[in-house]
């Protein structure tokens, strides 16, 4: 009988210990989990802008003069910038944070110079990724910049 009473008093002094341990571990687990979610979002965004650059370069290889909607006859959706911006599903990558440039091998913007079939054309995208988790304080303003580029040879000069 004495052992039973001792056991109860021993357990009584540790009452709530598991709740405190769970609260401490849950806090650390949530911080790590939010960091992993940010990493996943960043990886998805990086893959999405790589796909967007590839889509833009493919369209630029077929229609090298249609860089953006300002060119006559190249209104949306028939231009490189529109194709690159709309490659990713809606809402997952912010189109407003994409900076898209189209350039030819000689560094020009491919608009005024003579375009030659077989000449490389490059689409470069710089994307501003906003981190949301607790590790966002580790980078300036909580923003990372992802850069992707794709190169295709001009297939048809129209």
What are these regions (language model features)?
Residues 2-84:
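Alpha-helical assembly-interface signal, strongest on the long, hydrophobic N-terminal helix that forms
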Residues 51, 55-126, 156-158:
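Short amphipathic secondary-structure patches
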Residues 1-2, 7, 36, 89, ...:
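Generic N-terminal initiation segments characterized by hydrophobic and/or small/turn-forming residues
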Residues 45-46, 84-91, 134-138:
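Intrinsically disordered, low-complexity boundary segments flanking structured domains
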Residues 2, 130-158:
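Low-complexity, S/T/G/P-rich flexible repeat/linker segments used as non-globular hinges
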Residues 14, 116-118, 145:
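A generic fold-level signal
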Residues 23, 116-118, 141:
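Transmembrane beta-barrel outer-membrane domains
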